[in-house]
C-alpha cells in the first residue's frame, strides 16, 4: 500500500471566482502530489512504522529520526491539504447551528471569531496554516502553524484550515493575503466543519 493523492471533491474551476482553476490545478496536481510522493519515499525506508500519518504525527518522537522531518514536512503537507480540499464548497453554505453556538461560546460572536482567525492567518509570517481546532480541553481555539506542521502534533483536532502558503493564492491575489482570506470565508464547507466538530468533541 501507499499514500494516495485524493481527488478533489469538485471540479478545478468549481470554486471560482474565489479560487481560480489554475491555482487549484497547480496546488492539487503539483504541490499536493509532491507531498504524497515524498511521504511515500520516506515511509518506504521504514515499513515497520506503518502508514497511519495521523498516529505518527500525533507523537513525532516515534518516527525514526532519519525520516522524521521528511514526514513532518510531507506527511503533514498531505494531511493538511487532504483536509483543506474537503473544507471548501462550491455552493455557499451558512454556518451550522452547532458550530455557530460553539463559536459564540468560545469567541463571543461569529464576527469576533472571523476577526481572530483572519488575524492568525494574516499574522503567520512566511508559509504556514491558520486553524480552528478543538483543543485537549474540548474547547475551540484558533491557532496557526509554520510550514506544514499540523495541530495534531500538539494534541489538537483541526476542524477548519486555511493554507497561507503563497502558492495557494499568489496567482489570483498576488501579495494581498487579506483578500484571499476574505474569499476563503465565502466558500467554507460548514457541513464538513460541523462533522469534524462533532467527531472531535
From Swiss-Prot:
The gene is sodA. InterPro entries: Mn/Fe_SOD, Mn/Fe_SOD_BS, Mn/Fe_SOD_C, Mn/Fe_SOD_N, Mn/Fe_SOD_N_sf, SOD_C_sf. Mn(2+) binds at residues 27, 81, 163, 167. Signal peptide: none annotated. Belongs to the iron/manganese superoxide dismutase family. This is Superoxide dismutase [Mn]. Its EC number is 1.15.1.1. It is an enzyme of class 1 (oxidoreductase). Destroys superoxide anion radicals which are normally produced within the cells and which are toxic to biological systems.
